[in-house]
């Protein structure tokens, strides 16, 4: 994933902001976990997503010219604990948000 400048619906530029972007993404993931399925499934998925905190530093694009760090064992373990249903449901919710906010879709290469 690379950091790029995108144009918001109002024509303004949206700049990535490093750690705040990653924190926002993590918060979004946790919130998204609570938006679908039964209460038990929501709690399970939310817990799995909260467990991804050790991955936060690996989810921020590096500065130009820097090499992204390899994820540590705590991150890899936490990522392995996220169920497919939880991950796919969260990605689906996140992908639907721009349209719900009258923003252009996010396209990643």
UniProtKB/Swiss-Prot annotation:
Tapetum of anthers. The keyword Disulfide bond applies. It is found in: Secreted. Disulfide bonds join 45-86, 55-75, 76-101, 88-108. InterPro entries: Bifun_inhib/LTP/seed_sf, Bifunc_inhib/LTP/seed_store. Its main location: secreted. Keywords: Disulfide bond, Secreted, Signal. It comes from the Eukaryota. One of its GO terms (cellular component) is extracellular region. Pfam families: LTP_2. Residues 1-41 form the signal peptide. Belongs to the A9/FIL1 family. This is Anther-specific protein MZm3-3. It comes from Zea mays (Maize).
């Amino acid at each position: 994933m690379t950091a790029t400048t995108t144009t918001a619906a109002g024509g303004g530029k949206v700049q990535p902001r490093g750690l705040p972007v990653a924190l926002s993404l993590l918060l979004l993931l946790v919130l998204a976990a609570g938006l679908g399925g039964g209460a038990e499934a929501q709690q399970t998925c939310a817990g799995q997503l909260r467990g991804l905190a050790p991955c936060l530093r690996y989810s921020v694009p590096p500065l130009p010219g820097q090499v992204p760090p390899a994820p540590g064992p705590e991150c890899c373990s936490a990522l392995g604990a996220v169920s497919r249903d939880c991950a796919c449901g969260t990605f689906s919710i996140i992908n639907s948000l721009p349209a719900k906010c009258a923003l252009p879709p996010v396209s990643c290469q």
